[in-house]
């Protein structure tokens, strides 16, 4: 049964078509693993829903027709607990929504399930998607499958989609839905040695995705290979009338663009990303992969993105301001936690004090301050102006180049029991935040292991709506570096 869990999505699909195994057998193998998992990746398990999808898939395959709904039919997947799932508890890993059961389905999870995928359950995450280590969850931290070699210490899986990345790396599911606001798909994918892609802002509907920072939030996917990411992303992209920023631009068949050819492509290396604090091992792999792409016909050039140094403060001002606004709805009146009190004002105060964790409260306070009448122009408005400059840096760069190659994170994953300063945690997103501020597509792909035996990764950033292009470049990197897979226990 463990052998079935090792398969890629493409291999699962081929095996189901050839009747080498049934969807029920495939899903049962994963259900057994989920029931016995020790990573704390799943917080709500839905084996009955997964088995229903598996039986439907087997019935379809028994007809011996090639009119499959999608290559995801019967494939076991997990869904980050930020996406509303009708009739299934959706908590955003917060005490505030501990018992919230949505009456509707998010668009992306609906598309995924309609493609025939078998949902194994809801995945752990940082509370309201705020964090870079998955240590801010009301349901406890997630463990990475990788162990630090020198001291045998457990390490963090990254965040906020830590449950998504850990579950895929741990062979608990073949792929997982995540969300990416400032790097929450790409950074955990990097820490766990898997592939994570954030599409262009607006490619995937935000409807039914619990809001964190609306001008940045975007759904994404995490898988064990680039081709698998293409298949999953195809399933969840597309125009949605229920999301005002949803793009009407047609979605190509992304998997068909993966041809392993980068001849004639121009790849930029921004000098501003060569900053203090980057691991020497990551720099070495960055230079090695750039040389490999050059050997395969790509032109590699130095570029400048001059406003990169402002990305972190700009991001945290904007996302905190939007957090303050979006989370104002959690007041104990309509849904979620309610703490009874003598007055309405006291009920508001007690409910929010008990319902939100420390990191969420920190960002609400920062955001409220930035949006206050005396500071709005000084902080929020200025941050939006600099965001436009960061976006323009990318637009100008893409007039001369096709893709940008940068690290996904400055270091390998840190220890699960280490308590970094919140400011240090923010800086972990230094390489992922700029693309988020600009709304560009980006993919993290593993490139090797550190001396500590922990995954290292690079990121390919593309122009707007060029998900197909970054997937292809990532596939070339994957061919060179191989897949960084931890042996299945």
From Swiss-Prot:
EC numbers: 6.3.5.7
InterPro entries (alphabetical): Amidase (IPR000120), Amidase_CS (IPR020556), Amidase_dom (IPR023631), AS_sf (IPR036928), GatA (IPR004412)
Alphabetically ordered keywords of this record: ATP-binding, Ligase, Nucleotide-binding, Protein biosynthesis
Catalytic activity: L-glutamyl-tRNA(Gln) + L-glutamine + ATP + H2O = L-glutaminyl-tRNA(Gln) + L-glutamate + ADP + phosphate + H(+)
Active site per database record: 80, 160, 184
Keyword Protein biosynthesis: yes
CC annotations in GO: glutamyl-tRNA(Gln) amidotransferase complex
TM segment ranges: none
Keyword ATP-binding recorded: yes
PANTHER family linked: GLUTAMYL-TRNA(GLN) AMIDOTRANSFERASE SUBUNIT A, TRANSAMIDASE
Assembly notes: Heterotrimer of A, B and C subunits.
Function: Allows the formation of correctly charged Gln-tRNA(Gln) through the transamidation of misacylated Glu-tRNA(Gln) in organisms which lack glutaminyl-tRNA synthetase. The reaction takes place in the presence of glutamine and ATP through an activated gamma-phospho-Glu-tRNA(Gln).
Family as reported in the entry's similarity comment: Belongs to the amidase family. GatA subfamily.
Protein name: Glutamyl-tRNA(Gln) amidotransferase subunit A
Species of the source: Wolbachia sp. subsp. Drosophila simulans (strain wRi)
Higher taxonomy: Bacteria, Pseudomonadati, Pseudomonadota, Alphaproteobacteria, Rickettsiales
Gene (name only): gatA
